[in-house]
Every structure is written in structure tokens, then in C-alpha cells.
Design a protein with these regions (language model features):
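Secretory/organelle targeting and membrane-embedding segments
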Residues: 1-123, 128-394
């Protein structure tokens, strides 16, 4: 099937840094000769300048056109529909590389213009809501015009090597397939960075580490570890197994959560007295009898001593199994970059690495008690020096 990829926000930072370079690799692979790209922009743009600056790819430049429109005008979406002129053998992927505050209204306009036929798919970046209530509202709004199987919610951590390696091992190794409390003492998932917030002051001040990483990325990775893989299991029901695992996790206890902020953060965001956490760690438990008694912990932070994305399985015999992105990426088994893989799977209609509505809502339910406690300042906010080790904060 021919594919038209429509990118809302093609001139933005994410598009230049991630999407266009990923598309360069895809078109150069030769596997998707029937792919064309339509970049939606509020102002006229030079295709060659935009694409070649980001990718230095003449091939991608030739496959890309710019459609200029006002994102707040309903009639412009009708113009877009007519411009795309989708045929029975074509599909359209609507990639919303836009701020979350704009996404819901764009979806409304797209649906109202009739751009919601079965061969049209929506691709969203996180965050999927600011809290449980806003997530429920956003899911309800997208559901007015689009069915769940048309909606592809992107958590790029699910397309990274760590997630792929866990899935691979758990589906081929009998021991990993039967992970549980008989052999495992604890599971720790860590995403640490050496950098601070850089140029994301406004976003981070509104979001914080709990919302930015734990509610989404790390909770999804945890579900891969905890999910039941008893037959009949196929990769296509992966989301169903992830959700079942999430449903067994008890809502988080604020007394088992830690928040901290690196020294200098308040000056960076020009908000002296800010209580936004740049480090968050949440201890969890599962009601699943296979995981009863196993300590679960999700940890993330900025301005720490090292960059690490890892899942650490600690066994009762004192050994451990570490799924570390840096180690996996150094092998010959390296996968395509996350955004490249996301786009390829969306084109092919394979949804197993995308996050479903029920998963999003359950993840929010789990972290809500911690979120509310931190908003009420019921939990101390400690400070740490940039370059601190994770274990020194825990």
C-alpha cells in the first residue's frame, strides 16, 4: 500500500533532529518506494533548504512537499484533505509533532474534515496528558473521530534496544519466560542522564521527572519484565499482556517514593523556590502471585554521574542480569534508531511497540498518589550536587 506521511510541525526541532534523519534512512533502504512526505507548516518553506539542512539527502528532498495552512482554521483541513486526495490503495499517517496543548484541537479539525477513514492513522508523541484527568479527556477527544486501532501513541523507549532485548530474551529463553519470585529478588529500572534540562526549562518546570519518565517510559519497560508469557502468546498481543501486568501493580505508596532536585536548577528555570523534581524514584509492588514479595523500583534523574538506560534483574542467588542500552547498542545486533523503527512499524501497521489507551490510564492511576503528595509538598525535596551517583540519593 502506498503511504503518505503527513508531518504536522515539520519545521520544528524534533522533526529536524529525529524525524527527518530517520526518514532519510528509511527511504535510502529502498524498502518503501511508495512513500511520500507532506510537511504541514504555518508558513511557506523551502523544501530543499529544510530537508537537506537536516539530512543532506537529495532523495528525501525529492519525496517531500510542503503544505501551508493555518492549524486553527477548519477550512484549511478540508484543503489538506483535497490536497492529499487519498486513493483506495493509499494510507495516510498523520504525525503530530506539535505541543500537547495543540494536539487535541488538531485531531478535532482532522476528524471534522473527514480525514478519519480507516486508512488514516494518527501518530502522537508523549506526554499523554498531564495527569489522570487530562489523559482521560485527551483519549475521549481522540475517540470521537478515530478508533483505537487507528491511533499510534509513541513511547520511543519501547523502540529502543533495551525493550527489544527483553522481549527477545523472554520469548526464546525458558528461564526468562517464567521470571517471577521463585528466582528474582528485585527489579530496578533506571534512566539517568549526565545533562541537565538544557533548553527545556518551561517544559520541565511544568512536568518534572515523575511525569516525564516514570509514568510513561519506565512503567512500560516494567510491564515487559512482569508480563505473563504463557501460551498462546504472539507479538501481536504484546500490548494486552503489558496491560495485564500493569493492572496487577498496586498504586504507588508516596512513602516509598523519593524526589530530589539538582543544585542550580532553580536558577536555570528562573524560579527560586521551585519544587519541581529532577530526580524521582518510586518503589512498587505487584499483586500478581508470581511477583509477590519482589521489590520493584523505577528511578530517573538528570545531572547525575552517568548516562544509563538499564533494567537490572537481581536474583536470589546473588547474581544479576543487566539489560543496558550502551552494552546492547555496542553489539552487532544493533537495531535501527528508535524513531526509524517507530515510523517503519506504523507504516506496516504493526502496533505492538505503541502504547494503548488502557495502558496510559493505568500508568497514571499507579503514580497518581505520589503525584498528589508531591504537589501538596507532603514528601521532602532533597538537593543533590550535579554529578552525584544515583545510589547516593536513594
Amino acid at each position: 500500500m502506498k503511504t503518505k506521511l503527513v508531518i504536522f510541525g515539520i519545521t520544528g526541532d524534533l522533526s529536524r533532529r529525529k524525524l527527518l534523519p530517520a526518514l532519510k534512512e528509511i527511504v535510502q533502504s529502498g524498502e518503501f518506494e511508495d512513500l511520500s512526505i507532506v510537511g504541514v507548516s504555518r508558513r511557506d518553506g523551502n523544501v530543499a533548504e529544510l530537508v537537506e539542512t537536516a539530512t543532506n539527502s537529495e532523495l528525501l528532498t525529492n519525496l517531500t512537499t510542503i503544505f501551508t495552512m493555518d492549524l486553527a482554521r477548519a477550512e484549511d483541513y478540508v484543503r489538506l484533505r483535497n490536497y492529499l486526495d487519498l486513493q483506495p490503495d493509499e494510507q495516510a499517517l498523520m504525525y503530530l509533532s506539535v505541543p500537547p496543548s495543540a494536539a487535541a484541537s488538531i485531531v478535532d479539525f482532522i476528524g471534522q474534515a473527514g480525514l478519519n477513514t480507516p486508512h488514516i492513522k494518527l501518530l502522537f508523541e508523549k506526554p499523554f496528558g498531564f495527569d489522570l484527568a487530562s489523559a482521560e479527556d485527551f483519549i475521549a477527544r481522540t475517540g470521537r473521530y478515530f478508533k483505537e486501532d487507528q491511533i499510534y501513541r509513541i513511547d520511543h523507549y519501547m523502540a529502543k534496544e533495551v525493550a527489544a532485548e527483553v522481549i527477545r530474551l523472554r520469548t526464546i529463553d525458558d528461564g526468562a519466560r517464567q521470571w517471577g519470585n521463585e528466582s528474582i529478588a528485585s527489579v530496578e529500572i533506571i534512566a539517568s542522564e549526565k545533562i541537565g534540562i538544557e533548553d527545556r526549562a518551561n517544559f520541565y518546570e511544568e512536568t518534572g521527572a515523575l511525569r516525564d519518565f516514570i509514568q510513561g517510559h519506565l512503567m512500560q519497560l516494567l510491564s515487559l519484565v512482569l508480563m505473563d508469557l504463557s501460551p498462546p502468546f504472539t507479538i501481536d498481543n504484546l500490548a494486552e499482556r503489558r496491560l495485564k501486568a500493569l493492572s496487577q501493580i498496586q498504586v504507588a505508596d508516596p512513602t516509598k517514593a523519593i524526589r530530589a532536585q539538582y543544585e542550580g536548577y532553580q536558577a536555570e528555570v528562573s524560579n527560586i523556590g521551585s519544587t519541581t523534581e529532577t530526580f524521582a524514584s518510586v518503589g512498587l509492588t505487584s499483586q500478581d502471585e508470581r511477583w509477590s514479595g519482589v521489590d520493584l523500583r523505577l528511578t530517573t534523574g538528570k545531572n547525575l554521574d552517568k548516562k544509563q538506560s538499564a533494567i537490572i534483574i537481581r536474583y536470589k542467588d546473588g547474581t544479576e542480569h543487566v539489560f543496558d542500552e550502551a552494552t546492547i547498542a555496542s553489539t552487532d545486533m544493533k537495531l535501527p534508531e528508535a524513531y526509524e523503527r517507530v515510523l517503519v512499524e506504523a507504516i506496516r501497521g504493526r502496533k505492538y511497540i505503541f502504547t494503548t489507551s488502557p495502558e496510559i490510564l493505568r500508568s497514571w492511576e499507579i503514580v497518581t498518589p505520589v503525584q498528589k503528595a508531591w504537589e501538596m509538598d507532603d514528601t521532602p525535596l532533597s538537593l543533590y550536587v550535579p554529578g552525584t551517583k544515583t545510589e547516593e540519593i536513594l
